[in-house]
Amino acid sequence: MFTISDLHVKADDKEILKGFNLTINEAETHILMGPNGAGKSTVCKSILHHPHYEITSGHISYQGKDLTNSLTDEVAKSGIYYINQTPVEVEGIKNMELFRTALMAKGEKVDIFSFKKKCNAICEKLKMDPSFLTRNVNEGMSGGERKKNELFGMWLLKPSLILLDEVDSGLDVDAIKIVAANLKEYQKETGASLLVITHQPSLIEKLEPDHVHVIKDGKILLDGDKDLAFDTLNNGFSSLSWAGVMTDGSQNE
């Protein structure tokens, strides 16, 4: 179980998350939506302890371990994997070197023969040319190629909780299908949980979320299922009745 309890986070002396709460159980898919500036990306970056964001109070825990004050690499080693909307280029580092080093950081013994065999199988699954392994990380890659690169890391490193921040950004219809299909297949095989920040109807439909949350002013104000997502996308955030709505969807008398 992954839990965020009463999380308060600030950046540049401005409070962004103001009592954020979230619980994700094994194999669940959660969609997080909200207006611009509501704090969606801050949630993911706070989990990972991005240096720009300061947790001032609250708790983050995963599988019984308190991650509130953990270092980023400790969060990653706990089984949490992050895919953001703009994966960065890393000059001078080959994909193969990065992924092999990441496996070794988990304590796995990696011989080059079995590693290449595993990589080729993942490339086939993602319909990727294996030559990408000899390219520098994300260098000269399109948006779709970069997202596939991130999915490659998911299949290789086998995380149990995946955070996806606008993973559909810059992708065409076919690329979104590939992303969704891989996430569903991976979840079915491993029982992993997903926290997905998106406003893309086709991705939401394909992922079949268990829960949809709408965040505003740094906290979740509405919870529901995928109907909430589509109502919001069809009518806009301004159509939602925020006042008096509890996070279980009931009315506050």
Predicted regions span which residues?
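The feature captures the beta-strand-to-loop junction immediately N-terminal to the Walker
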Residues: 33-35
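ABC ATPase NBD coupling module
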Residues: 66-81, 232-234
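Conserved structural motif at the start of ABC-family nucleotide-binding domains
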Residues: 2-4, 17-19
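ABC ATPase C-loop
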Residues: 154-155
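Conserved ABC transporter NBD signature motif
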Residues: 56-65
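Walker B catalytic motif
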Residues: 166-168, 174
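Conserved beta-strand-loop-alpha-helix hinge in the C-terminal portion
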Residues: 215, 219-242
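Q-loop/switch helix immediately C-terminal to the Walker
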Residues: 86, 92-106, 118
